[in-house]
Structure formats: structure tokens, C-alpha cells
């Protein structure tokens, strides 16, 4: 073949290899993937009638993907070890070339379809598919020619061997995952029989509801193994806590638990954070720096927000997970790693794979054992024990006596908690800082709940619900609705108070000392523009919202005439002032995400830089926990 011709052929082959590797990483369905690989071979390189056979446990080759053959027809075709040309490839582990099939006595023509070739000659090239040195299948293609065998079979064999290697890796990955799944299912079945409720908090995890008890049983089951665990659940449901619990119950508990928030770092930083860098790798790299993979050696690496890493970085991570080794940025030495991986995400990874945003092969790698954390609204039994746990924790951290009224607990029980356990924890902490006598009462929750409920408010607004209909659930009046005789109770109902901005409460000295930082001033903030609707406001309370104010409001004074003096803020309908809308949403998002700007940005569909700018613009003090 002339030089130019060979050059263009190898370029085409390279392109096809690129296509094939993309196809293999793009779908969760192995058969479908293999059919597409064969289609690409036929389309790009005129390699027709492609066939992929895989070896079963009985050492029989079965056809799993074929060009131009129905699934039913393909399912019938099999070769035993040594049978026909295909069986020989399995037996010898060597490629085979048949220049003219019509003259080959070994050819069994089991798949048929070559009868209408007339004057053309069909040749066959077949190569073994190997995984970790073992033959797991056979890939064959036909070359059809008008002029007899063309004699390019050497390059065909080389090229098909590369394709077969890629297929081998994919098959191995699918089989490993399937095996681990089967193992876990057997284990789950066995352990379910022994499942007993877990009464006391384990590793600080409070759990009394049946679904959290099941989660903890799962934690017990997976902890002893090295299997990768994927923890899924909404923001604030306790994914990191569960990851730590798995580590603490594992044989690796005395080695480090290292966490990386993948969403918080741009790709270049993430790479050097995870893999480390060598001195001089980039401007500012003044000395060698160990990455988190190295720091977690012998222990557990927790990759939080794994769904947020870029496609480019997904490929890098996949390589490390497959090969268990990596190089530091700017370094050439290969470093071996021994970490147990736990990943977490609140994204729908299957959807991301479907949209091509998350690699299917990485998905398989990390989705070995999955633990789903239910949102707090689906495990209301946990609200009381969690609230008491946070009260006790605050009291202990600050060296003070603190209790919570039963009525306050009732209020908490009726909220929807879109920010989950983190929102509940923040709410209790804010209320605790306002308690002057060591008792958390319904009233002291009000300011906290303004913020908590703002998230619900935003959800309803984005759904286009009637703002008036929300008011009883959200407004401070709702929280201020307390029994007669109490400050702010029905006796004062006709003149409800606007919740005054509470004075900054100095943080108790103990807390600051415990954190090793100077004391901060906790400034509870009522939500700007959050005002109560007038009595009889339009729109029914939403039945999905169990917040306290679903009960009817006490009678209200009629709305003032336009000529009258402006009413107190609490008397005005619950419309969001135009200028305050972004501020409200910001507060909501920051509260919901535990004041992590990157997460809040994602929730709002903004960039982190935009959120940071908006926080400054609205003069919102950033809380640090
Ligand atoms: N079952 C629980 N018992 C006690 N505390 C809990 C529980 N679940 C969550 N928490 C507390 O709630 C807060 C949020 O939990 P965590 O950070 O683990 O959530 P997450 O799901 O990882 O959130 P994100 O997705 O936003 O990273 C933490 O302070 C954690 O200690």
C-alpha cells in the first residue's frame, strides 16, 4: 500500500479507536454498546458482519452482539471451545485470518447470511477479547471484496486487537460490578434476617425512624469491606456523617478519613488537591505537596459532590480508580494508592449519564454499594430525637444548661425542612443563642423559623403558587401564635408584632474556645420582605406544607385604607418587595446549603462568583460553622 494511503488509513483507525472508546464509556447497556461498536467498525472501516461473542461460566461462547442479526437469532448461536474458527480463537487465545471463507473447511457458517455474495469473496478476521490476560470472548469481522483477498490482514489484526482490548476492559468492569452487586444482595438478604433496631446514636448518628434504622443496618453491613460506597440524598441529610460512620466502623478506622468537596474547587486546583504536586509544577508551587489520595493512604477518601466534577476530570479520576496509581501534578513518579473510596452526591447520576454529563464507566466504578439517605420530611420520627440531640450538643459545647419546651418541639415537628437535618440544626442553634434563661420556647424559634421557612416560601414561589396562600405557613405571625397569656399570644393577636431584628447576641465564650477562634457575634436576621398576609388572604394553605401556621390565623384587623398611615410590616400581604427578591433567595439558598456559596450558587443557577458578589452587594454577613 502506498505511503500516503497507509497514513490516511491509520488516521482513520485512530479516529475509530477514539469513537469506540467514547461508545464504550457512554452507555450502561453492554449489548447495546457492543452493537454500536460494530456499527462504527462497519461505517468507518468497512468491517462488515461484526460479531462479538462472550464466554459464559460453562466455557461456551455466546453471540452477544452482531451486525444485521436480530437479538432472537443471535441468542441461538454459540460455539464450544475449539469448535469452528471462533471456537479455535477461544481455545488458542490467538487471532485467526481466513482469506476466503468459501474455501475454508473449518468454517461452519453458523450465523449464515453470506449466501448472496455472488462473485465477491468474504474473508474473516477474528481476535480474542482478553481481560487481565484471560480470554473472555471473541471479536470477528468480515472483509468483502470483488477482487479476492486483499492481503491487509496484518493491520486488521493489530487494529482489532486494540478494539478487543477496550471491549475486554469494559466487559471486566461490568462483570466486577455485577459480581459485587450479587454479593451485596446476598449479604443484604442474610443481614435482613438478623436486623434489629439500633437504639442509641451510633457515631453521632441519631436514628429512630425505620428508614434510618435500615440505613444504619446497611452501614454496618458495608463497613468491614473495602467496597466503594456511593451515598445519595438531598443536601443536609447527613451524607458526610454517614461516610464518617462507615469509616469509623471499618478496619481502617485508625487511618485518616479525608474529605474533598469536589464542587468547591475548580478543576486545576482539584487535580493538585487530590493527586498533589511537585515543586515548580506551576507558578506558586514552591514545594512538593502531598495530595489527598496520599494523605488518605490506608484510610478512607470521601469525595463529596462527585456528580459535579468536569468530564475531563472524570477521565483522570477513572484512571486512578482503575489502576490504583497516579502521578503528582508535574511529577513523573508513579504513586500507588490504597484508599477506600466513599462518594456522595445529591444529583441524579443516571440522568447525568443519560445526558452525557457523567461517564458511564465512572458511574459503574463508584456505584458499587449505594446508600440512600431519606429527606427529613420522610422520617418525621427523627425530628424530635434530632432536635433534642442538637439542644444537648449546644449545651455541652457551651457549658450551659439548655432545654426545649414541648410546644417548641411541636412547631419543629410540623415544618417541612427542605434543608433537612442541617436546617434543623441551624434552627436550634439560632434559637439557643437567643434563649436568655436556658429554655428554648416557641417564641425563640420564631426568628429561626423565619429563615427556615423562607426556603419553603421560595419553593412555592418558584412553583408559581399564590403568595397569599402561603402566608399562614410562613409568616412570623404563624410562629408567634402561642397560647393565651404568653407574650405574643392571642391576646395581642389583633396587633401582631413585626419580629424586631434581635440585638446581636455575643457567642458564648465556651463555643469560641472550643473552635479555637475568636468569639463571633451571632446576628439573627429576619427575612427582608417576609410579611404576614391579612386575614382571609387569597389561596388555601398548601396541604403539602405541615408548617405550624396551616391552622387558621386568629382574626385580624381589616387592611388599612390607602390614606391611613403605613401599617406595621407584619400587616402587609406577603409580597416580596421587588428590590428584595434576590436577597430573599440568596438567604434561602445559603441557609439551605449550610452557608456554602458553591452549593447555594448551584441551587440558584448562578456562578459562585455571582453569589459572592450578591452577598456583598446585599451586605449579607456570611455565617461560618
Ligand atoms: N442523623 C443525624 N444525626 C445527627 N446529626 C446529623 C444527622 N444527620 C445530619 N446531621 C448533622 O447535620 C449536618 C449536615 O449533615 P452533613 O454535612 O453530613 O449533610 P450532607 O448530606 O453531607 O450535606 P451536603 O450534601 O450539603 O454536603 C451536620 O452537622 C451533621 O452532623
Swiss-Prot record:
Binding site for ATP: 233-240, 296-305
Superkingdom as given in the UniProt entry: Bacteria
UniProt GO BP: nitrogen fixation; phosphorelay signal transduction system; positive regulation of DNA-templated transcription initiation
Gene (name only): nifA
GO molecular function: ATP binding; ATP hydrolysis activity; DNA-binding transcription factor activity; metal ion binding; sequence-specific DNA binding
Lineage of the species this protein comes from: Bacteria, Pseudomonadati, Pseudomonadota, Alphaproteobacteria, Rhodospirillales
DNA-binding region: 597-616
SMART domains: AAA, GAF
Name of the protein this chain belongs to: Nif-specific regulatory protein
UniProt source species: Azospirillum brasilense
Every Sigma-54 factor interaction domain range: 205-433
